[in-house]
Every structure is written in C-alpha cells, then in structure tokens.
Amino acid sequence: MYPMKLTAPCKDYIWGGTRLRDEYGKKSDSDKVAESWELSCHKDGKSVIANGEYAGRTLEEYIEKEGKQVLGKNCGRFEYFPVLIKLIDAKDNLSVQVHPDNDYALRVEGEYGKTEMWYVIDADEGAELLYGFKHEITREEFAERIKNNTLLEVTNNVPVHKGDVFFIESGTLHAIGKGILIAEIQQNSNTTYRIYDYGRVGKDGKPRELHIEKACEVTKLTPPTRPTKPQGEPVRKEGYTETLLASCGYFTVKALDIDTRAWIEASEGSFIHLLVIDGEAILSSGHEPEHTLKLTKGESCFIPAGCGNFELTPPERCSVVMTYIE
C-alpha cells in the first residue's frame, strides 16, 4: 500500500468558469471547467491513480483488487464507497436544487442520497448563496411558489466569504451563487433535483430538465439551523493549525494550515484524502522514500487505511483539506 496521487475527471456544466484550469491545473478540452471530481468512485466520473503500481487504473479498480480493507474499518458500514469530493468554480449561479436522503434515493434512484458540506476557498465581493428558507412554509405554499415563480421571495440568501463552511443536510434547498470557489465533500451520489434554473438552456438548446414532483417530496420546509462557520475552533499543533470544518456519519473534514510540517496518520480506521487548496507540500514517510509525493495546488492523494505515519512538509505555507471517515 502507498499514497496515490489522483487525476480528477472534470465537468463542463454551463455555469462553470476557468479558474480550475488556470489556477488549479485541471486539464480539460472544454472552455469551462465547472467541477473537478477529486475523489470519486462514482460511475459518472472516476478518479484515476497517477503513480506507482496502479498508475493508469481507477481508484475503484484498486479497491476491487485489494479489497475494502484499504478503506478502513470505519467504512464497513457502507455498501458503496462513501464519499465524493469536488472542486467547484461557479462563474454563474447554479440552479436552485435539493438532494434526497438515503431512504428516498436508494428506493427511487438506486444510489445514496446526498448530505454535503461546502468549504469556501474564495468568493467575489458581494457573493452570496441560497441556503434553505427564511422561515417555515407549508408544502402547499412551496408548490404554489414554484408554479408562479415566486420561490426566491422566501429563500434564505447568505453573504459568502472565504473560509465559510456550509453543512447542507439532505433535503435542504440550496444554490451556489456566482463568483464562488468551493471544496465540496459529499456522499457518493450524483442525484440532484432542480427546482429553478433561471430559464437557461443546455447544450442542446432546450431548457434544462426540472424535477419538481420529486423535489416537493424531499425538500425540508424549515430554515437551516447550522451556523455558516467551521464546526470547531482552530487548534494549534507543532508546525500547523488544524480546524474541524464538519463531521457527520458520512465524513469528517479538517483544514490544515501548515507552517513547517504536519503529521498524517493513516490508521486502520479509515483512508485519508488530502486536497491541496493553496501552496504545495511534500508527503513522505521515513520507511518508504520511493513513495514520496509532491502535491501542488489543486492536487490530491488517497492514502489507504493502515499505511502508517506521513509527514506533510511545505517549502512555504500550505493549506490542505483532509477528509476521512470516523
């Protein structure tokens, strides 16, 4: 077992920009790069291993070959690979949308529902996003406002700043606004129900599909209760600062702001995913120098469970998002 640098598939949705290509090194033939799927075993876009014995094979193929123990004991409760991690560049507004919970999604769509979190990497001045409702409404009012295009009168629009954290529980109405760059950690699902899309058309020249009936069945009609900040306070450790961004039954996410070095322990409990969002760093272990990795801005790696201890060392300051399963 060894740390694996991953190559991310990219998506060219109509609302995307160019920052992921220009600033984060994502390779795509499209003019727009809306999303890069940094950690994915989903059928709609799979991470490919870039180094070592499994170079050129998908992460899913590696897991199938080596067995689910590489995911760790804490992943034993999941039937499928549990998470999907993305970088999202919203040059334009995303649709107003909602994701179903596990029970509904598994029954209707044949895959997990989607609870997710957003870590705001950057935001234009005045940027905002839609996060639930201002106040509780009835299901009848919800359906009527969708019908007469007045839904946005009762939605909760929140100013967005770099470093904000939004926990989007399944069933929460939401929309990322234009001018926002986000790291998204979510359940392994690509099920989205669009409710409102500003009258836009897709590449085929036709209005993009809406999913009103399903959205009405799964949307929570009460305001969100989570604060829009990290779940924990910054904790100073030797060489770096660690902040718990969010933790739930599906994922735990921390921000590492590294001055000199950070220690990463890949225990038997869970794999670890590291995503560099600023700067660069060397990932190394004293006992396997051949598996040393250089990770630059926008690059990520998968460390199998039980791989041991690693040192993450930047030439200068470096910011990393670390995800694992508890």
Q: Model-derived features: where do they sit?
A:
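Short acidic-glycine-tyrosine-enriched beta hairpin
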Residues: V154-F167, L181, S285-C307
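Short, structured patches in soluble enzyme cores that scaffold and shape functional sites
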Residues: V98-P100, I121-D124, F133-H135, I146, ...
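Transition-metal
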Residues: M1-I137, D197-T228, V253
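Surface-exposed loop/turn positions
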Residues: D92, D164, A262, S270, ...
